[in-house]
Swiss-Prot record:
Keywords: Glycoprotein, Hydrolase, Lipid degradation, Lipid metabolism, Secreted, Signal. It comes from the Eukaryota. One of its GO terms (cellular component) is extracellular region. Its EC number is 3.1.1.-. InterPro entries: GDSL, SGNH_hydro_sf, SGNH_plant_lipase-like. It comes from Arabidopsis thaliana (Mouse-ear cress). Glycans are attached at residues 82, 143, 178, 194, 315. GO terms for molecular function: hydrolase activity, acting on ester bonds. Pfam families: Lipase_GDSL. The active site is at 39 (nucleophile), 334, 337. The keyword Protein biosynthesis does not apply. Its main location: secreted. This is GDSL esterase/lipase At3g27950. It is found in: Secreted. The lineage of its organism: Eukaryota, Viridiplantae, Streptophyta, Embryophyta, Tracheophyta.
Amino acid sequence: MAISKITLAIIVLLLGFTEKLSALSSSCNFPAVFNFGDSNSDTGAISAAIGEVPPPNGVAFFGRSAGRHSDGRLIIDFITENLTLPYLTPYLDSVGANYRHGANFATGGSCIRPTLACFSPFHLGTQVSQFIHFKTRTLSLYNQTNGKFNRLSHTNYFSKALYTLDIGQNDLAIGFQNMTEEQLKATIPLIIENFTIALKLLYKEGARFFSIHNTGPTGCLPYLLKAFPAIPRDPYGCLKPLNNVAIEFNKQLKNKITQLKKELPSSFFTYVDVYSAKYNLITKAKALGFIDPFDYCCVGAIGRGMGCGKTIFLNGTELYSSSCQNRKNFISWDGIHYTETANMLVANRILDGSISDPPLPTQKACKLTKK
């Protein structure tokens, strides 16, 4: 009799273990993605709001300008591809918009904090306000049309969607231009506070599944290396003080996410270490097939100071910016943004969970368990 009880207990344990494995191995089937950020994930907002992001941007994949500051796809594009969802339509784009499977509120030049120093007026707080308005209007129209308007997200998608945030680079890069390392570090708590307010507002609106990208190694951006030639470098050639600030920002961000996991019931947070993935591109550039980690592909018509995609008239002649032919051999597209090849390498690390905490693939980001 004792043997049969032991056997039964083992069977029960095995069944429970099998069920847990099955749950973890299955995909989350996120029906939508709502993204917030800056030009690293802007799929056309700044183009719709201020002016077109001109060619040769987009040439590698889209064959045309597609509102992205890159030669092709961004990290967010690879994420939606992996989730078998369409590319995200910018919230600010009203022509041919389809929000069935989410929307993109990221806008180039945006900061976390509201500041006039940022290129874009659409700081993170504004992006969240836009989302709240978007959700309210969507629910209203959905009810008015009895769910027949198929270009809008389904009413239950908002609680089942994946919410991705990739923003903070501009807060640090702009601040570095007129602050010392220690002065800039002193602003981080306020930046994190603004970020936290945004997350809590999204949670209040029903968001439950969050993928939080930390900031990359801003001190490795070629345009900043050119702007600050006298600043001390790290062993790989990046601006050491600015990367120190980025590391401190990421440390405080991760601590805050750990805290929010406890504060917000039923929330599922994935902290993604984008910094390590992007810094790895720099430190292992040659092995990954890149020529020079600090060179960039899209250059101005009169040198590297004009800007990618811009044109000027010089002595009555219109001059165009151009891009290199060997785009896959470059990390940086224009001195600020990444090439599609670099974006893909970083995205692969995000999607397989190797730089995430907890270390689960993006497709399984809803399977996290509370500790």
